[in-house]
Swiss-Prot record:
Record's keyword annotation contains Acetylation: yes
N-acetylmethionine PTM positions: M1
GO cellular component: protein-containing complex
UniProt keyword annotations, A-Z: Acetylation, Methyltransferase, S-adenosyl-L-methionine, Transferase
Protein name: Putative protein N-methyltransferase FAM86B2
Top-level EC class: transferase
Cited Gene3D superfamilies: Vaccinia Virus protein VP39
Family assignment from sequence similarity: Belongs to the class I-like SAM-binding methyltransferase superfamily. EEF2KMT family.
Gene Ontology MF terms in the entry: protein-lysine N-methyltransferase activity
Complex and partners: Interacts with EEF2KMT.
GO biological processes: methylation
The enzyme's E.C. designation: 2.1.1.-
Record-listed S-adenosyl-L-methionine binding positions: W139, G165, S166, G167, W228, A247
Amino acid sequence: MAPEENAGTELLLQGFERRFLAVRTLRSFPWQSLEAKLRDSSDSELLRDILQKTVRHPVCVKHPPSVKYAWCFLSELIKKHEAVHTEPLDKLYEVLAETLMAKESTQGHRSYLLSSGGSVTLSKSTAIISHGTTGLVTWDAALYLAEWAIENPAAFINRTVLELGSGAGLTGLAICKMCRPRAYIFSDPHSRILEQLRGNVLLNGLSLEADITGNLDSPRVTVAQLDWDVAMVHQLSAFQPDVVIAADVLYCPEAIVSLVGVLQRLAACREHKRAPEVYVAFTVRNPETCQLFTTELGRDGIRWEAEAHHDQKLFPYGEHLEMAMLNLTL
């Protein structure tokens, strides 16, 4: 295989691997590129490699997605193969049969591969979906912020980090594994999301602060219930963060006002210490919402500047979405 062709195949396999482990929508997979390669070769090795990068991946075997998702993926893979080759590939049907025989769990997993060779895995109970929270979803801005953090570890090394609206915990878990913070505080107002967060912290080999058997080389990790509207200075002063982060929390005008308010109270808690650095990442869905955020910041005397856009390198998120991140000075 020519070097250019080999590089293209590796890129294709990586695309399938990262999207499948992260349980991205099937339409986001590089199906057209796969079909083109299948037409150019009668060899079934590529499909076998895709199976090893997806349903047979060690991370998937340990922390599988839902049976339904795996079945839909394999069905689509078989369809693409049959559209090009008349001879069926027994291995595809064997794996599909194994998937159909598997018992559906109440937990589904999404995994994100890290540049260190490790991964972050999120376990999500289907029971949470019906309770009206957004914490079950891993928003694209959380992936964008996590990727930025991994590229800029100096912002977090040996520092105390407070995350507002942690949701499933992807960003914080990536920072804890890759950026060596001294302490990390996950926070969210919803009790069901907090329960999920604690489970994901433990699932990824980290210990909660109350666990005296924790790894001394790992950051001190806390999961805190924090409602921006009712949190008083005495509660916020216990955190004493050096860095505050938030991703995709600008979803309505009320949330924006609440966010700016809690940031002001956090700054007041630092007394004679330097105010924390603040990074807020978001997907630009509605320019008016972004304008409202910067207007509210200006009204409260909070300066801001946009961080330079970074290219997608590690995590699979919407390629055509407009992402932004602001660095705030409290």
